[in-house]
């Protein structure tokens, strides 16, 4: 059974908030600096942000490389720091999720293990996939963790999707939001129209 987003966190997300992408802290020899990484997490909490997104572009996708093996550590460190702060307000923990289905499922399960509330599901790097295959991947991940969809512009590895794709996407249970970074008004409107036409129009945030 998939995890469901806490109502207080959903209310924060729907009301509108700032969820910055968490950078990766390295020392002068380009090694992971855990102390400064934890300091960055504390900074975002102190700044009044509504949450942080960890394991996304600013955290560098290379942390997933087998030769680097930092994805687990980076997710764990941020989550530990947030939990130890014992904030008296909602704070959304978002984990970046990417790759083919098997990788995306493994990352979703890891995010859940460390107490993340949402998975920001990238659809980049799937140029050879059909829209039907990508939608099934979304369903598989959403069966594990609540999902924020991510429409990424083609110039940085994304792809263009049809209105029909987003119409089906919006009907998938446990999709909580869609981040639209297509940087194209027509593609953006496709997402807006699809969500507004779906049965879940009152449940999905943009």
Stretch-by-stretch model annotation:
Residues 143, 153-206:
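Catalytic alpha/beta core domains of metabolic enzymes, predominantly
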Residues 2-160:
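Active-site beta->alpha loop and helix N-cap motifs at the rims of alpha/beta catalytic domains
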